[in-house]
Amino acid sequence: MSGHSKWATIKRKKDAIDSKRGAIFTRVGKEITVAAKMGGGDPEGNPRLRLAILKAKSVNMPKDNIERAIKKGTGELEGVVYEECLYECFGPAGIAIMVSAVTDKKSRTTPEIKSILTKLGGSLATSGSVSRLFEKKGVIVLESSQIGEDKLVDLAVGEGAEDVINEGEVYRVITTPDDYESVLHALNEKGLKSEESEIRYIALISSEIADKEVAKKVMKLIEQLDGHDDVTSVTSNFELAASLEKEFE
């Protein structure tokens, strides 16, 4: 599970600069619309929609926005037709990157993702060549000021979490996809608020970067991919070498 603290930092900085919460709501809204289109508008009978709604609530998305996104998916409201895309990529120094996107026009999104990769030393990979290096996990990020580590471990692991990682300012709770919902619910019941929560790809093996210039390029690539309007998540197996950590604080 190592190598993700720097990515968490990048993401928090991006979300702060991004402070257009509307951009976050748009991303989550697309996920809700796709989930409702695929499995119907009733979250009780549509686990994927239920999880998308949980994610929306974790970023304080207004109830009206959630309901509109559902209705667009079910056809009750007119809206754009979205489809999911998963891009398997290689970055500088051969790092592996998984990019998830939701788009209304794949023929536009794919060349744009490819262009970002090409400009920063990356490339699209063949199907299966990168995804085999990752697995899907539930990831719940909490500010550490809310609860002590021992208490969180007892609570989260007691509900089925696999791991709790202390990253200083935040804790990262890792679950299986099946246990994600129950763990998140248990944390919410205790009044704990998550900075982010989702089921996403996690690297099985990390790739350490010790060269400062390569590290800069990798981080810029990840930020630009994550900044694309259609991208919903970016995960890489990039890990910053200990010798460079102070350089990027």
Swiss-Prot record:
It comes from the Bacteria. It holds the Pfam family TACO1_YebC_N. The keyword Heme does not apply. One of its GO terms (biological process) is regulation of DNA-templated transcription. One of its GO terms (cellular component) is cytosol. InterPro entries: Integrase-like_N (IPR017856), TACO1_YebC-like_2nd/3rd_dom (IPR048300), TACO1_YebC_N (IPR049083), Transcrip_reg_TACO1-like (IPR002876), Transcrip_reg_TACO1-like_dom3 (IPR026564), YebC-like (IPR029072). Gene3D superfamilies: 1.10.10.200, 3.30.70.980. The keyword Zinc does not apply. Its main location: cytoplasm. It is found in: Cytoplasm. Keywords: Cytoplasm, DNA-binding, Transcription, Transcription regulation. PANTHER family: TRANSCRIPTIONAL REGULATORY PROTEIN YEBC-RELATED, TRANSLATIONAL ACTIVATOR OF CYTOCHROME C OXIDASE 1. Belongs to the TACO1 family. This is Probable transcriptional regulatory protein LBL_2537. It comes from Leptospira borgpetersenii serovar Hardjo-bovis (strain L550).
